Amino acid sequence: MEITCPDWTHETAALAEGFTCVVGVDEVGRGPLAGPVTAAAVRLFPGRIPEGLNDSKKLTAPRREMLAAEIHTVAEVSIAHASVEEIDRLNILQASHLAMGRALAGLPSRPDFALIDGHMVPKGLGHRCRAIVKGDALCLSIAAASIVAKVARDRIMVDLEQQHPGYGWRTNAGYGTKDHLQALLNLGPTPHHRRSFKPVHNILYQEASISP
């Protein structure tokens, strides 16, 4: 099985087309039952690219933390979120795209080309974009964005766990693990749970149906 590592090929191609501010964009947190969806936009500079960049899911938590700190030092970084309320109102796909747009808008330099993880380019970004399937494993800028987004969201979930103990958010990051689902049944949903997601919705419906 061939092991792929992200490289600078996609950035080089965009720069060769005449674009001058090329950034990578990725999001994390589409699947969890709780917490925001978080996106990051990162502009890397040749000669200052941290070693070891890869899809955040392939890295240990300590390694992600180290790389995120380095990325913040050597690159232009913007992190943005879409709230649980926005996820429930819009749907998770549209909320993810909203977070991506906010991340792009928050960069100190205005990008003229965005490399986006996935198969779909969000509408209305106001930038030239290219979607790259598995981009976080193929493109260095997207890999960097995946790392800083993951670290930022994990920190949010650790903070939320202190406010709402018992759901295991420090370790499950809001995903629907067995322990998290059991806690939902025992403790009920919090304001940070996504009511539009089926496991949470079902518990709320069950509670409503048995209430006096």
UniProtKB/Swiss-Prot annotation:
PROSITE patterns according to UniProt: RNASE_H_2
EC number(s) from the headed UniProt entry: 3.1.26.4
Keyword Repressor (UniProt): no
Compartments reported by the entry: Cytoplasm
CDD domains reported for this sequence: RNase_HII_bacteria_HII_like
Required cofactor names: Mn(2+); Mg(2+)
GO biological process, one term: DNA replication, removal of RNA primer
Keyword list, A-Z: Cytoplasm, Endonuclease, Hydrolase, Manganese, Metal-binding, Nuclease
Cofactor binding, note field: Manganese or magnesium. Binds 1 divalent metal ion per monomer in the absence of substrate. May bind a second metal ion after substrate binding.
HAMAP family reported for this sequence: RNase_HII_B
Annotated NCBIfam families: PRK00015.1-3
Protein family according to the UniProt entry: Belongs to the RNase HII family.
Full protein name: Ribonuclease HII
Organism expressing this protein natively: Cereibacter sphaeroides (strain ATCC 17023 / DSM 158 / JCM 6121 / CCUG 31486 / LMG 2827 / NBRC 12203 / NCIMB 8253 / ATH 2.4.1.)
Gene: rnhB
